[in-house]
Design a protein with these regions (language model features):
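Flexible, low-complexity linker and terminal segments
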Residues: 64-208
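Thiamine diphosphate
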Residues: 1-82
Length: 209
């Protein structure tokens, strides 16, 4: 079973109560929370960074950088959500939402539905249960952090080693245009961070941004 919730950054605030709780509960299937941020306030009453909210809620975050990745990352978000029993936040921004690009389609793949399993300790967030789930969520996040170091969506593009840039999302496109000679670590999973991969990349460049 797969489900998706879509909102802007300000709507993510309204959804905070169930979001923080479902982070502890986990999901018996796949759950992706699509949140559209608006850097520059082009059509919003304020600016917010969903990555920070997701970090506080202990939720993993995927951030595509173009139209093709927007499609591929959605599929991956559901797959990772099912694998790690975690809701995944899928962050988009104004520039990504207005972008155009070549997107390759593929045949639809059917996904097996999972039956509802009654589990009060896992699904009812009373204090006694929540304390136990806190331990489990830290364990799952640690497993995901380790996996982040080898995920293909976190990739290194080595060029000149004088300058290295760590980036994600639409800013990746800006970096490639402004500094085509720089080495780049492009993050597709921005929370949790792939610490080992970052350390390895940092050790190979003279100046890191």
């Amino acid at each position: 079973t797969r489900a998706m919730a879509c909102m802007k950054h300000v709507g993510f605030n309204v959804a905070a109560d169930p979001t923080y709780s479902v982070s502890y509960m986990g999901v018996n299937g796949g759950l992706v929370i699509v949140v559209a941020d608006d850097p520059g306030l082009y059509s919003s009453q304020n600016e917010q960074d969903t990555r920070m909210v997701a970090r506080a809620a202990k939720l993993p975050v995927l951030e595509p950088s173009d139209s093709a990745e927007a499609k591929e990352f959605m599929k991956l978000a559901f797959e990772l959500s099912e694998k790690f029993d975690r809701p995944f936040v899928y962050r988009t921004t104004t520039r990504l939402a207005h972008s155009q690009g070549v997107v390759e389609l593929e045949e639809r793949t059917d996904v097996e539905d999972k039956a509802y399993v009654k589990d009060i300790r896992k699904n009812v967030m009373m204090p006694g249960n929540a304390k136990l789930r806190h331990v489990e969520i830290e364990k799952r996040n640690q497993e995901l952090a380790e996996a982040a170091n080898t995920l293909p969506i976190n990739r290194v593009e080595m060029c000149d080693t004088k300058i290295g840039v760590i980036t994600s999302g639409i800013p990746y496109q800006y970096v490639k245009e402004a500094l085509p000679e720089a080495s780049v670590l492009k993050l597709g999973l921005v929370n949790p961070l792939p610490k080992k991969l970052i350390e390895e990349f940092a050790s190979k460049v003279d100046t890191l941004y």
